[in-house]
Amino acid sequence: MSHLSTINACKLLLFRRCLQAVLLTVGIQFLLLTIFLLFVNFQLLRPLHWISVTLSLVCSMYTWFASIPLVGAVVLYGMILCQQHLAERLYCPTRFRWLVHYAPRKLLFLAAHLLVGYLTAWLYTGYMHTDYRHLWYKCYDQECISAYHVYLLGMGIFAGCYYFVSVHMRQEVEIEFPIVNHLWGEKLREVLYSSLARSLIKSLLPTLAYTLLFWLFGGVVCHKLSHIFAVDLDERLEGFFGVATNGRLLFYGWLLTSQILSNMHLMRCFYSMFLSEEFPLAITKNRAAFVQEKEVTVVAALGLSNVYVVQCLAAKYLYNLVTAGDAEKRSELFQLTEPGNRPANWRSLCDQCLSLFGNFTDELIDSMQKISVLKGSPSSPPLTPISENASASLMAERVLTRQYNQMHGIRAIVSPRSNAVIDRPVDRIHRVPDWCERTSMQLEQSLQLLINRIPGIVYMFTEPEGAKTAFLLTHSLPLVFVIQALSQICVFSLKEDRYGVVQTDLPDIIRSMSRLKGELDKLSSVASNLRGPGSSFSVLRGAVRRSLFHICVAFGEYLSELIPSGEELHQLQTVINQE
């Protein structure tokens, strides 16, 4: 299978999982609506009537038709979330490049958040009391703008904006791989309980913040709406006490905010649940497969660096395969394949893993050169300039040699014309005057300082220190799984590798891990100052140290044969002693 067909096959499978997440999210909308109606229509003395009325409202035709706009917004939200999961993770060195690449996508995602928040508030207000249900109501035999309805609609928009700013504005969507695999029903129940309970607490701050904003600017908004629709102004929420003392309105706003936040959090969790499921990969390429069958191997999936999700799933699959304790499945890695009885499976896997190690380490070294604390390029010794006395003595020696040759009739090897060219004084070479060079350098430095003093230029068009290093560490999850899987393969090869296909590559594997460990040790002094990758750095460094330790312990008797005596062998022995 070609590289392009591998990408298409993986994206098609992930797109199907995203559709399943969207369908589950649509079903959850009715569960959230049921919970909201149970709170709004609460009747302690008539519990059966309370539950029956709530269920009849959820199952009514009005609910099914009124929820169509919200379902459409949820589907749009899910498609944008799917696109962000499958998009390539590009590094933007400057903030201007980040705006050019990510701003259109972020603006579209913000619009989806606002739309879901507004339509959720619009749908839920239809089940409240008459004062909250419509945009205007009868007051003193006239039509008036309902400030309660405006407050709740604005609360929905503000809740969607709040979730986008706090979760998605500066961060990319990530998949959380569970440490312990549970049944699908257990995971769904855990996500529902935790999301609903957490949203009740997290919705307090945005509710209070929006209430303060509505007290400051709500009157202006209601006045504009009354002027647009040619109706009277509602005066029930004028002043601070008019807003702060309305307990029912504040309760509805808090409950609505918690529903919107939990809804968006559940959509994010559902995508993580479906996309983190085990990917159907193969170790050995089935040569007898039909042409229509698109079988993706682990090696091919690990090579898809432009689809980060697939690379993570392939690395996780390899890690689970090695650590599951099934020796029969691991034997596919060591077996010899036809034709030629060559270790094709191990050869391709080892080359791909070493390529991942090498590329990541090289990029990490290049990015660390831009950190001022770690900057240390090897300096070459300066060239010794020729002094004027040495130049004069050389010219005098040439003149004496020419006179001696003419006196004794010795011809020159080269023609006199060539001698004239060679003996031309160095001072006659045309050079740019020193004052011109100094002037041009001063002008260049002055212009650069002038540009840097313009507000926003340095902020927008300069690469922050350590940004590339932070980007690499944040996206190092595939490397964490691959390093641990490869070390376990090397350890198991002592008993399961009957042909010795792994031992020939052990020196290269140890050197690659040791090289990466050395660079991470250098970075440990400044990792806390980098923005974002603190936990990622700790996880990666711990995985490298642990993997190298397992290999060194398993092959401790043979280290001197695998690695020649020297600094590398001393470092490996130090790793064993430290652990």
Curated annotation (Swiss-Prot):
Instruction: Tell me which PANTHER family the record gives.
Output: NUCLEOPORIN NDC1 (PTHR13269:SF6)
Name of the protein: Nucleoporin Ndc1
Stated family: Belongs to the NDC1 family.
- Entry GO terms, CC: nuclear membrane; nuclear pore transmembrane ring
The organism is Drosophila pseudoobscura pseudoobscura (Fruit fly)
Q: Which residues lie on this side of the membrane: Perinuclear space?
A: 43-60, 128-144, 224-236
The molecular function terms of the Gene Ontology recorded here are: protein-macromolecule adaptor activity
Where is this protein found?
A: Nucleus, Nuclear pore complex; Nucleus membrane
**Gene encoding the protein:** Ndc1
Residue spans, topological domain Cytoplasmic: 1-21, 82-106, 166-202, 258-579
Q: Quote the InterPro entries the UniProt record gives.
A: Nucleoporin_prot_Ndc1/Nup
Role played: Component of the nuclear pore complex (NPC), which plays a key role in de novo assembly and insertion of NPC in the nuclear envelope.
Keywords per UniProt: Membrane, mRNA transport, Nuclear pore complex, Nucleus, Protein transport, Translocation, Transmembrane, Transmembrane helix, Transport
- A biological process term (GO) from this entry: mRNA transport
Q: Could you tell me the membrane topology recorded for this protein?
A: Multi-pass membrane protein
From which domain of life does this come? Eukaryota
Q: Transmembrane ranges?
A: 22-42, 61-81, 107-127, 145-165, 203-223, 237-257
